[in-house]
Amino acid sequence: MYKRQILKRVEADEGQYDDARDVFWVSGAAFCCRADVFRALGGFDDDFFAHMEEIDLCWRMQLAGYRVRVVPGSTVYHLGGGTLTTDSPTKVFYNHRNNLAMLYKCASPVQRAVVAIVRPVLDLMAALSYLAQGRGDNFRAVFRAWRDFLRWHGSLSCKRKEIRQQCRGTVAGKVYRGSVLLRYLLGRKTFGRMM
């Protein structure tokens, strides 16, 4: 089973996730998709690099009326961090930038309004945390991500319009509405107890 990790701690696999089920997204390291669906939705976003392109596609698939499923009986071997190391400022940049772009493209108007208020505060906190740790390159990467995201606004608006035109489905009930990190810090150490 794909390991669930939060704050570099991995939840023990005790068979709690052995059933196939619908999920919001699956890891690109273990991703299979019908070719006709992949082509119809334009595949992975060419503007994303190595981070969140699979989440973006899974979100778009569901908005277009398709399902995303996890099949735990599968076996996949994957070298994590093979493209970029965990502490790489480039990884921090792509994580922040691509996540902002994905949210802008795929989220509902209400979700986007919440993100517009909360996200700058959270990203500023993340940047300041990097600075306090002496990781100035990661601090700057967060602001570069915002700069690039804001420059993309025109092309992202076009992509958002295309996604909305294909919209026949919903992700209602599939997106967790709380903070996984906060629940973890409050003592709910397994994903089963967080949800």
Question: What is each residue range found by the language model?
Answer:
Residues 63-161, 165-173, 179:
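Active-site-adjacent helix/loop segment of glycosyltransferases
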Residues 34-35, 60, 99:
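Short, cationic motifs built from Arg/Lys/His that form the positively charged side of catalytic pockets
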Residues 27, 59, 72:
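A cytosolic small-molecule/anion-sensing beta-strand core signal
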Residues 11-23, 32, 157-195:
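Glycine-rich phosphate/pyrophosphate-binding loop
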Residues 39, 59, 103:
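A cross-family signal for key residues in well-ordered alpha-helices
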Residues 3-49, 55, 64:
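Acidic/His-rich active-site region of diverse nucleotide-sugar glycosyltransferases
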Residues 50-51, 92:
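Short, conserved glycine- and acidic-residue-centered signature motifs
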Residues 54-60, 76:
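Short active-site alpha-helical segment characteristic of glycosyltransferases
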